[in-house]
Amino acid sequence: MKAVVLAVAVLFLTGSQARHFWQRDEPQTPWDRVKDFATVYVDAIKESGRDYVAQLETSVLGKHLNLKLLDNWDTLSTTFSKLRADLGPVTQEFWDNLEKDTEWLRQEMNKDLQEVKQKVQPYLDNFHKKMQEEMERYREKVGPLGTELREGARQKLQELQEKLTPLGEDLRDRAREHVDTLRTQLAPYSDDMRQRLTQRLEALRDSTTFADYQAKASEHLKTFSEKAKPALEDLRQGLLPVLESLKASILSSIDQATKQLTAQ
């Protein structure tokens, strides 16, 4: 299972680098993407959660039970923010170490990508050239038909459509042929890249780096657990006033209902 987790993590990291290698953009680290998503998600939950709490407190049941949930909601939000802040550096350190430990693998994969790119570039250039020629050929055949339409008005529109249909179908069929040819030409290189990636992952699995990573991952989980304990305890303490208030309100309502039944 650990090997699967590591493989996915490596693919995630190298995949990100490979995508930016082709696009030539500045890569965003995996932790940055996680932080961006988590921040937006948590902020949305905080806002929507406060709305739900306000609705519950102002409802008939909330008024009857004399709930004071909003008094504690801001405290809970602060507690969640503190929890996120406390655990953030630990996770950041983990991603930094993982990126550093797999830097050699990313470099090897980038070399492989560069080599494959150089090999397939002639096929891509030829494909682009063929498609340009097909489009020029199509324009040369369609151009006179446009002139004919302008000169012949509406009655020739149907004739123009009949003439354009086979031309469009011919262009489509020839384009498909070029795409199929390109796919056939690139297939060996795709298989080669897949085989290279498999070899890199097998080498990683058999290397001492993998054993070191397992030890570091265990250490990280232990540190994460130790860091999380006080933060989770703060969260529990923040929840206690809400639970106690709700418990007291419910017991009070039950007591009042019992007295009313006894009086009857």
Curated annotation (Swiss-Prot):
Gene3D superfamilies: 1.20.5.20, 6.10.140.380, Apolipoprotein. GO terms for molecular function: amyloid-beta binding; apolipoprotein A-I receptor binding; chemorepellent activity; cholesterol binding; cholesterol transfer activity; enzyme binding; heat shock protein binding; high-density lipoprotein particle binding. Sequence repeats lie at residues 67-88, 89-110, 111-121, 122-143, 144-165, 166-187, 188-207, 208-229, 230-240, 241-264. It is found in: Secreted. GO terms for cellular component: chylomicron; endocytic vesicle; extracellular vesicle; low-density lipoprotein particle; spherical high-density lipoprotein particle; very-low-density lipoprotein particle. One of its GO terms (biological process) is G protein-coupled receptor signaling pathway. Glycosylated. Palmitoylated. Residues 1-18 form the signal peptide. The modification Methionine sulfoxide is found at M109. Keywords: Cholesterol metabolism, Glycoprotein, HDL, Lipid metabolism, Lipid transport, Lipoprotein, Oxidation, Palmitate, Phosphoprotein, Repeat, Secreted, Signal, Steroid metabolism, Sterol metabolism, Transport. Residues 67-264 are annotated as: 10 X approximate tandem repeats. It comes from the Eukaryota. Participates in the reverse transport of cholesterol from tissues to the liver for excretion by promoting cholesterol efflux from tissues and by acting as a cofactor for the lecithin cholesterol acyltransferase (LCAT). As part of the SPAP complex, activates spermatozoa motility. Homodimer. Interacts with APOA1BP and CLU. Component of a sperm activating protein complex (SPAP), consisting of APOA1, an immunoglobulin heavy chain, an immunoglobulin light chain and albumin. Interacts with NDRG1. Interacts with SCGB3A2. Interacts with NAXE and YJEFN3. Belongs to the apolipoprotein A1/A4/E family. This is Apolipoprotein A-I. The lineage of its organism: Eukaryota, Metazoa, Chordata, Craniata, Vertebrata.
